[in-house]
């Protein structure tokens, strides 16, 4: 198991220890740094709801480095991002693949970013089923419906047509950060924090 760093803050004569993720949360930063499953989704959703209760207007920053994961868990995060009142800014570092890419493009308009060497990948949902033929048919139908839902979400946030999304997600489709801008998955490639702060000040 990986060790979670602890940071110490000193205020006057008082010292307080935080794990690194709790300290980032104080600055309204959420890190999605793993595959998406129900446990991770519950943590992310809880953080979004907490930050909304702290300040319903102040921006939330979500950093994404994820290979994707369970669709239902990812959609729980997506729906919560859209539900909360504060705008959610997204930034990809490393990779945002599959459900990670969908969450990346679901950030507030004009506030979706990637670092220069990030990799974004979109594709159709996949799954394997076994059992009776009727059950397999039921699951296949549900997978097709899920794909339609994901395509609709991506079309909404990228401005691409449903037909284009359908074709482009047929197989694994990798993009550089610059290509993701052209496609509409993100709004800008950032090379330094100063560029982000200048944009926010404009």
From Swiss-Prot:
Pfam families from the UniProt entry: CLP_protease (PF00574)
Reactions accelerated catalytically: Hydrolysis of proteins to small peptides in the presence of ATP and magnesium. alpha-casein is the usual test substrate. In the absence of ATP, only oligopeptides shorter than five residues are hydrolyzed (such as succinyl-Leu-Tyr-|-NHMec, and Leu-Tyr-Leu-|-Tyr-Trp, in which cleavage of the -Tyr-|-Leu- and -Tyr-|-Trp bonds also occurs)
Keyword Hydrolase among record annotations: yes
Cellular compartments per GO CC: cytoplasm; endopeptidase Clp complex
Subcellular location field: Cytoplasm
Sorted UniProt keywords: Cytoplasm, Hydrolase, Protease, Serine protease
EC assignment: 3.4.21.92
Domain of life from the UniProt record: Bacteria
One of the record's GO molecular function terms: serine-type endopeptidase activity
Any single GO BP term: protein quality control for misfolded or incompletely synthesized proteins
Stored SUPFAM superfamilies: ClpP/crotonase (SSF52096)
Enzyme class: hydrolase
Active site residues of this protein: 98 (nucleophile), 123
CDD domains referenced in this protein's UniProt entry, alphabetically: S14_ClpP_2
Assembly with partners or alone: Fourteen ClpP subunits assemble into 2 heptameric rings which stack back to back to give a disk-like structure with a central cavity, resembling the structure of eukaryotic proteasomes.
Role: Cleaves peptides in various proteins in a process that requires ATP hydrolysis. Has a chymotrypsin-like activity. Plays a major role in the degradation of misfolded proteins.
NCBIfam families: clpP, PRK00277.1, PRK12553.1
Family membership: Belongs to the peptidase S14 family.
Protein name: ATP-dependent Clp protease proteolytic subunit
């Amino acid at each position: 198991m990986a060790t979670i760093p602890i940071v110490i803050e000193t205020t006057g004569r008082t010292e307080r220890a935080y794990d690194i993720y709790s300290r980032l949360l104080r600055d309204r930063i959420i890190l999605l740094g793993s595959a998406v499953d129900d446990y991770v989704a519950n943590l992310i959703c809880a953080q979004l709801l907490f930050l909304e209760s702290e300040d319903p207007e102040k921006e939330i920053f979500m950093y994404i480095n994820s290979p994707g994961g369970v669709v239902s868990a990812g959609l729980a995060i997506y729906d919560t991002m859209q539900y909360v009142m504060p705008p959610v800014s997204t930034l990809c570092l490393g990779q945002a693949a599959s459900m990670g890419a969908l969450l990346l493009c679901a950030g507030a308009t004009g506030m979706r970013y990637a670092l220069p060497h990030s990799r974004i990948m979109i594709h159709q949902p996949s799954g394997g089923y076994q059992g009776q033929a009727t059950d397999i048919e039921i699951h296949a139908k549900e997978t097709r419906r899920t794909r339609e839902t994901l395509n609709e979400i991506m079309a909404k946030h990228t401005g691409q047509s449903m037909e284009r999304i359908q074709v482009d997600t047929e197989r694994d489709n990798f993009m550089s950060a610059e290509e993701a801008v052209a496609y509409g998955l993100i709004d800008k490639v950032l090379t330094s924090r100063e560029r982000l702060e200048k944009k926010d000040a404009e």
